[in-house]
């Protein structure tokens, strides 16, 4: 193969790897959370304010990122919502006095610190964020 073809192949593979890694999010929870897996239906109910407890009965405190690719992937893959739909639903809940929007963070490191320090907290980060301070949860369909 010529050098040009190798370069095109390598660039294509790098693009595929970056796209794949951008599609992955890790669900994180406070280490005191007793569950190790959660259904997307329960996750959606918690993040949309319909549930305030995990399946084991313990309190759930959802936290989000303020925006960005990881936030969008989480909303799409786990809640089946766009960022606009998510905001609109929460604005309605807040306006009618039925709920308070989840605390949102500018960075994954700030989200991890909050989750580590807050009993019942659950959130999400990219796969590249260090997660030693928190527990990882498995999402099931």
Predicted regions and their residues:
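Sec/Tat signal peptide C-region and signal peptidase I cleavage site
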Residues: 16-22
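Exported/periplasmic ABC-transporter solute-binding proteins
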Residues: 23-141
């Amino acid at each position: 193969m010529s050098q040009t073809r190798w370069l095109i192949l390598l660039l294509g593979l790098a693009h595929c790897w970056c796209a794949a890694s951008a599609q992955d999010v890790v669900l994180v929870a406070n280490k005191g959370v007793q569950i190790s897996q959660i259904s997307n239906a329960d996750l959606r109910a918690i993040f949309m304010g319909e549930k305030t407890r995990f399946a084991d009965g313990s309190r759930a405190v959802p936290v989000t990122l303020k925006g960005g690719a990881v936030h969008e992937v989480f909303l799409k893959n786990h809640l089946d919502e766009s960022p606009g739909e998510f905001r609109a639903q929460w604005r309605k809940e807040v306006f009618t006095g039925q709920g308070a929007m989840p605390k949102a963070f500018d960075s994954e490191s700030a989200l991890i610190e909050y989750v580590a320090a807050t009993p019942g907290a659950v959130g999400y980060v990219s796969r590249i964020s260090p997660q030693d301070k928190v527990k990882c949860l498995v999402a099931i369909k």
